[in-house]
């Protein structure tokens, strides 16, 4: 089978160091599924992983995937051959930038039947990240009426995570405030369901006042935590929650959180599969809920760009686009 990977980490300005490899098709065992990959989504985590040291070469990236189950392990109980599934995988295994992939069943759910594979591929990683942040970190209720009066600020509402997080938060009853700056990103964020869209290139505190917003219960940062850290501390309500998916690049003063008793959390969606936590089945459960909501018409996919064919050039192009920070929604590559 064909796989696209690299032997050592590289920056894009070094040229295209992706290579095509030919591997034997693996055989599933235990709770593993063998999936014939149809579509993948490329995420910022792919570009970051590409620049990190390679422990075992070649390194095959890729997290989001949609595909058909070809074979199942002898302990699989939730799926059967022929099921169309989607998932986001784990960094400690070969990724989805290959024709066939082994994946454990508790990280997988059946894909929405009303979506094409290139649409469904936009949802697993960002959807899981949003679900974990909203339910596990912020602790919002799964009963929308109980979230009435609660508010959420999403930094970078038009990105992949922000786009699906807006839809999920709106479904579960939160008032959603997002940030965007370009006309197209503002329009996109509104279409995703944002109640208020603020310009992150202008003073957010003043815009809160202009929109009669006294503070928010939750802040979800999906872009440049260092830039927004002090601002988020100022905008969150006392005893509120701040979560980020972007690591600090410089030292920040956690004591700023003290006077308001603010909870600050680094959300890393892969922590469950990486550490084999007892509740790793939540990935399956959250993806299953996403499928149900999509099929019922409550969530929409966030794919905005599709590249046909997985090869070294198309993958390099995808990484270039993501590193330009110009994407709205998600970028998907079709293998079929």
Swiss-Prot record:
Cross-referenced SUPFAM superfamilies, in alphabetical order? GroES-like, NAD(P)-binding Rossmann-fold domains
Q: Give a yes or no for keyword Nucleotide-binding in this entry.
A: no
Which parts form a coiled-coil structure per UniProt?
Answer: none
InterPro entries recorded for this chain?
Answer: ADH-like_C (IPR013149), ADH-like_N (IPR013154), ADH_Zn_typ-1 (IPR014182), GroES-like_sf (IPR011032), NAD(P)-bd_dom_sf (IPR036291), PKS_ER (IPR020843), Quin_OxRdtase/zeta-crystal_CS (IPR002364), YIM1/Zinc_Alcohol_DH_Fams (IPR050700)
- Report the GO molecular function annotations: oxidoreductase activity; zinc ion binding
Q: Which UniProt keywords apply?
A: Metal-binding, Oxidoreductase, Zinc
Q: Which family does it belong to?
A: Belongs to the zinc-containing alcohol dehydrogenase family. Quinone oxidoreductase subfamily.
Q: Which NCBIfam families match?
A: adh_fam_1
Name the chain's protein. Answer: Zinc-type alcohol dehydrogenase-like protein SERP1785
- The species this protein belongs to is Staphylococcus epidermidis (strain ATCC 35984 / DSM 28319 / BCRC 17069 / CCUG 31568 / BM 3577 / RP62A)
